[in-house]
């Protein structure tokens, strides 16, 4: 059989989200079988969902041909059902697939990507906005409740050097907020030269390679707290935390400032989710199959 995206509520009820125009006759294939749609995210009320769907454009019985616009982003609600997000302004013939993977709490702003190369946004189901072409953004996942803050990791698309993180507001534009710093927060380990922080300053490294790469996974509802990580599998990862009016710090530094000395010695390098209130964070260590819950109801950040 062919599966499809569904919503499961806390009382156990399951609602099928359906498919787009193919009557569940075909879908994307995997070792678990075929699926006509995959869900990625829901808004805060569970009334809207977004994800990936499959459409048989050329009616050959196959719904996953690349570069034909058969693998598409969808949005769903109970009243209108599943429908494609607008990709009419994108070069679909050059894109193997497009998906939607995040939605703001109020359902107004949807984020997605194609082939992990481009960052897209849809505002109130309008045309796709290519944030990579506009700002040099990598695929984005973190968005505030009202959709007016989207965390973007920026790169120079000509040199591929990091440019730090910025908050994008579809109504007001871009606000840079910096990043963690080489040597102070993030080691720079060269494949051939070892730890360059032993012979260079963080500013000297930044001048050559740009800012440390940042991945922002989530933010609080008001967008005042961001969680993510910096680094790579070559240099190792460090957990990252940004608090409005305070700035960036590593999680090791944060735990140390709270007096949680034992936690500061254990890498919290993969914080992946934060509650809407910003008081609870879930994450763990990159590559390890366990998670921690960090309760931040009482936080003191001082030097």
What is each model feature region?
Residues 1-303:
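Conserved "turn/edge" positions that cap or connect secondary-structure elements
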